[in-house]
Amino acid sequence: MKIISPDNDSIRYTRRVMPDGDLYFIFNEGNKATEFTADFDKVGVAKEWNATDGTLQPINATIVNNRTRLTIKLEAWESKLISIGKSNREYNIKEYGVKGNGYSETATLQRIINEAVHNGGGTIVIPAGEYLSGALFFPRGVDLRIEKNAKLISTVDPNEFPVIPTRFEGIEKRWRCAFLNFDHSDGVKVYGEGVIDGKGVEWKKIPFGNSGRPRLLCFTDCPGR
């Protein structure tokens, strides 16, 4: 947890990393009430524990730079227990405007991914059918499920695969991005019975150049659980 504003030396906290999210015990050691804004090192849905009935109640949060941002009020000597867990919401791409008509739908797919992040994460679902796309970027908190008889197919267009700072064969360098890119996504899952088709044979016809060809998948700083 990092306090953004205002500076406050009366706040203490402990964090416990759980399989389904993180728990934060936050305590005001001061003798005055305080309000502060803090970033939590997790993308997810924020809830506060109600000490009266033992339930977790949703609280307002925003996602900023791959972290969950909260504004918290604490009375003198008051403590709160905050839970931040990955959303179980699913985003079926067909329900969000993807057509699967043989044309590249990179922008629409990326918009769905970004919407999921904005809402605290979740799972992007690729249903049965064939879907064409350029490079996609999955921020923290977003999983990918490719269902049976579904195929996510790469375009063979260098313009849809920008050259970015990345790591290639253990060396930090500028290189063409992968088809599916996951960055700082702790516990991310890519699963299902469908197919990810990177069109490797077709990409071999594109000159390697100084920036290479796309990889199929790239996980950067993505520790498991």
Segments predicted by a language model, with ranges:
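Extracellular/periplasmic carbohydrate-active domains that bind, remodel
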Residues: 82, 88-225
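Carbohydrate-binding surfaces of carbohydrate-active enzymes
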Residues: 1-88
